[in-house]
Amino acid sequence: MVAFAHLPHFHVVGFTGHRRLADAPGVAGAIREAIEMLRREGPGEWIGLSSAAAGSDTLFAREALAQGCAWHVLLPLPEAEFKRDFSEDEWREAEELLARAEQVRVFNETEAREDAYLDAGMETVHGADIVLAVWDGEPARGKGGTADVIAYARDVGRPLVIIDVQTLVIRRENGTAFAAHDHDLEYFNSLPEAPPAGGAANPFGAPGEILAFQRKVDHKASRGAPQFRRLIASTTILHVLATLVAAAGLAFALHAAILPWMKLFCLDGALAVALLLRKQGAHHHWVRCRLAAEFCRSALATWGLPRNALIFAELDLPGMRLLVRALQVMHQRSAGAKPVAMEDFKRLYVTHRIDDQLAYYERRLGQAMPQLVWLRSGFWMATLAAITCTAAYALHRVWNYAEIPLGLEEWLFYFLPISLPVMAAALISLISINDLHRRVARYREMCAVLQAARKQIAYGRTWSSLERVVQQTERALLQEVIEWHSITSFAESH
């Protein structure tokens, strides 16, 4: 059966509300109405995100689960500490609900109690697309109360749905900020299918739609890779050629009609390339597809972990949020469905991820290093030759020590002193344009990181230790393309 190469759309509604309620059934009905309203507005699956405190949190959890939403729990404290805020009956109800949660995460295990509640509330806002609140309109009675969470949501521009505790009226704030559709994920999903060959390996049997999705965004990135470095280098080379044409005309007293046209052709070509660089939108699309492909490659390589390792937990990139969320939720739901023995995981991960990436970085290092050596050597040779020609000209003008043939004099004293510094400047600029120093250092660093990870995995004896190494490795592998994403998302290329 052929898998569809698209990923599902997951919306998250965060929740905050009071513990003590005068009309709990009425509040429950208002919560139900608000969730139904959101589900009508946003296609795809909805996930509820909240704590599990008595009162409003419990009502929200029951209503979300009753409507078929998954429930993700963010506890401000470890369960043993969190339990102290409940009566026996309240905790019995909370335990029953926690058993139905798809995910339970303790956000903070070290802070003071009120600080922990505030941090958990802020994290709920951060992880949500829209925040649903049950609020009496009054200031918070302690740090981390509902009013504090609402204030934070307002400050960061998160859309709010507020249920008034007294009147049960539902009102909205900043509603236009809620994106029912994610254009980036829709763009990825709309890409045509890729040829069956190519793409990432799937050693742990991840869902077919993720593999198909990875192949098509990887195919798009590979076919649409922009040639911006080559274009920038071509502007430099065209300017150098224009300078050499002008220098030749002056040095050799050439007055051929073709020379001004040659220089004009070079300068017009450089201008055309510069304009092309400003108009080129392929760079941003390429980076988006490349980043999406690498996120999926990382997910496929780590699918065999028995627990839901939060590899992407700290990443919140513009345009990638729903893609990362889809991968995280799908991984979480399948974690442990097909258990993989530890030694099998180590062998497959090393073979299909570590060794594959190590070979890639070694290959790229082998390509970049000769370019760096050649350009650096060319710069020094051109610079030293320019100094030699200029010094010879200066000495000749002072002492006139020998008669020099006219042809040699034109080359040695006029053409080369002008052209060689320009060529040296072009060669050193090509090193920067091609980012060779950083790339060589990056490739060497990644080879060292991967070799160290290989050894750590070989000696790993527990899943916890393996998860730590895998998380560090995957984040290091993603760092390069994340940097490119930042450049193209927040800076204009000139």
Residue ranges with predicted function:
Residues 1-172:
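Acidic/glycine-enriched connector segments
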Residues 171, 176-494:
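Conserved non-transmembrane functional hotspots
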